[in-house]
Regions:
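Hydrophobic, lipid-facing positions within transmembrane beta-strands of outer-membrane proteins
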Residues: 1, 39-43, 80-84, 121-125, ...
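Outer membrane beta-barrel
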Residues: 1-65, 78-79, 83, 87-90, ...
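Surface-exposed loop and membrane-interface regions of Gram-negative outer-membrane beta-barrel proteins
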Residues: 1-5, 18-31, 68-70, 106-115, ...
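Repeated loop/turn-to-beta-strand initiation elements of outer-membrane beta-barrel proteins
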Residues: 6-10, 51-57, 93-98, 134-137, ...
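Outer-membrane beta-barrel translocator/channel fold
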Residues: 15-26, 140-159, 242, 249
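Transmembrane beta-barrel outer-membrane domains
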Residues: 34-38, 75-81, 114-120, 170-176, ...
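Detector for outer-membrane/organellar transmembrane beta-barrel domains
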Residues: 89-216
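Outer-membrane beta-barrel "beta-signal"
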Residues: 129, 228-230, 253-260
Length: 260
């Protein structure tokens, strides 16, 4: 639950390091694997004093997932996450948004018997815009270190922070990338088609995960669907979804799914 008043929002709602307005339509709830999609307890402020511009900043409760062992534990976090974004809109269905996040991730080492922190960061650009009267484009790109918690495909891998094989008793934040691009074609005011391709990628650093060849390296996502807005309060659709996962040993698996 959350509450908004005088451009302030407090409570549990969608996070500041994402762009709901640039997400393509999918029946799949999470959406593209390279998109950022999450909720957080937060205090945020939105400034709308400039025509066509919107600026937002938030302080969010941190959620850190890491690859731990008998040597490491994720500690109670000492700092919130900080996000900021700026958005320019040139009509009701077209905008460009840039944003960023910075976070401090705390862990404890059983060898050192003390808490340490790793700094993570992320940058993001997203857009949606008209291409004539029938087409709508969507896109987003995200890059950073230690932002796995926010990327759809990587959020379940516990890789916000991981052990550093080259520094005994230390953990590190790995680089990661996520992006998507999609198109929507409006057949009529009530019926539209859309298709999106997306990718998320985890990069190796300081020898991790050289000894874990089955670790996720990158994933790909393709979706195509059709929607019919039967009434203002009722929408039906059908969707084909295909996903691929490739590990650091280059083994690849895939799956297909139909959604209604």
């Amino acid at each position: 639950a959350y509450m908004s008043f005088l451009n302030f929002t407090v409570g549990y709602t969608y996070g500041g390091f994402m762009d709901l307005g640039a997400l393509p339509s999918t029946i799949d709830f999470q959406g593209p694997n390279g998109a950022t999609f999450y909720r957080a307890t937060q205090l945020s402020y939105t400034y709308k004093g400039l025509k066509d511009f919107r600026f937002q900043a938030s302080i969010e409760a941190p959620a850190v997932d890491g690859t731990t062992s008998s040597q490491f534990e994720i500690a109670q976090q000492r700092m919130p996450d900080f996000t900021a974004s700026a958005q320019y809109s040139w009509n009701s269905s077209s905008h460009l948004r840039v944003g960023g996040i910075i976070r401090s991730m705390t862990y404890t080492s059983t060898e050192r018997d003390k808490a340490s922190s790793v700094t993570g960061y992320g940058v993001q650009a997203s857009t949606t815009f008209n291409l004539g009267k029938k087409w709508q484009a969507f896109g987003q790109i995200n890059y950073g270190k230690g932002i796995g918690q926010y990327l759809n495909d990587i959020s379940n891998l516990n890789v916000d922070i991981v052990p550093n094989p080259e520094k005994e008793g230390k953990m590190q934040a790995l680089p990661m990338l996520g992006w998507y691009a999609g198109l929507q074609y409006n057949i009529s005011p009530k019926i539209f088609l859309s298709s999106t391709y997306s990718m998320s990628r985890l990069y190796s650093e300081d020898g991790y995960p050289n000894d874990l060849p089955s670790t996720y390296r990158y994933g790909q996502y393709f979706v195509a669907n059709v929607f019919w807005n039967v009434t203002p309060n009722m929408q039906v659709g059908a969707e084909y979804l295909r996903g691929w996962r490739t590990n650091f040993d280059n083994s690849t698996n895939h799956a297909n799914r139909m959604n209604l």
